[in-house]
C-alpha cells in the first residue's frame, strides 16, 4: 500500500480525470517542473474515496512501453502547437483525419479550447496556474511529461514517479479541476 485516496480517482474524461490530476501533480513535484503533460488514456481501475492506493493501481494507470518521464524546456509556442495538434486529431471535421479520442492532460497550466475552430485557433488563454500569468509564446517553461515515443527520452519511469509522490503524500485529495474550459460542445 502506497497511500490512501480521499477522492474519487478515475481516468475517463476526454480532457482530464482525477487520476490524471494525480499523475500530473506527481510529475510537477517529483521532476520540479512548472507544467506537466500526460497522455490522454482512459484505462485503469477507478478508486473510491477511502480506498488504499496500491502499486498495482499505479501500474494499471501507467503501464505502457515508454514510461520515461522527461524534464525539458519548451516555449509557449511549442506547448500551444502540441495542444493544437492533439486537438486536431480529435476534432478535425474530416473523420479521416481524426486519429484519437483523448486530449493530452495538462498540469500547472489552464487554457480554453474551442472545438469547432480550425487547427491553430482552437487553443487560447493559456495561463500558468501558479502565477496566473499568460503563457508567453517566446518564453521557455520547464515541462515534464511521459509517453514520448522518442527512444532517446531519459528519466525515471512514470510508475515510480507517481508511486514516490503518493508514498510521500500518504493521503490523496483532489480538488475539482476547472483549468481547461471547453467551448462548442
Where are the regions that the model predicts?
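Catalytic centers of hydrolytic enzymes
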Residues: 1-185
Amino acid at each position: 500500500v502506497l497511500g490512501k485516496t480521499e477522492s474519487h480517482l478515475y481516468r475517463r474524461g476526454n480532457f482530464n480525470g482525477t487520476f490524471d490530476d494525480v499523475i500530473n501533480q506527481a510529475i510537477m513535484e517529483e521532476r520540479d517542473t512548472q507544467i506537466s503533460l500526460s497522455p490522454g488514456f482512459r484505462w485503469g481501475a477507478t478508486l473510491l474515496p477511502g480506498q488504499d492506493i496500491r502499486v498495482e493501481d499505479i501500474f494499471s494507470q501507467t503501464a505502457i512501453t515508454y514510461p520515461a518521464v522527461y524534464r525539458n524546456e519548451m516555449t509557449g509556442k511549442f506547448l500551444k502547437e502540441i495542444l493544437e495538434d492533439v486537438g486536431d486529431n480529435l476534432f478535425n471535421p474530416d473523420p479521416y483525419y481524426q486519429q484519437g479520442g483523448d486530449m493530452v492532460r495538462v498540469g500547472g497550466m489552464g487554457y480554453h479550447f474551442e472545438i469547432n475552430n480550425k487547427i491553430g485557433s482552437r487553443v487560447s488563454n493559456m495561463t500558468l496556474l501558479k502565477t496566473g500569468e499568460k503563457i508567453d509564446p517566446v518564453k521557455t517553461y520547464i515541462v515534464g511529461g511521459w509517453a514520448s515515443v522518442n527512444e532517446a527520452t531519459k528519466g525515471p519511469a512514470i510508475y515510480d514517479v507517481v508511486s514516490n509522490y503518493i508514498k510521500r503524500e500518504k493521503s490523496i485529495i483532489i480538488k475539482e479541476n476547472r483549468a481547461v474550459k471547453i467551448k462548442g460542445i
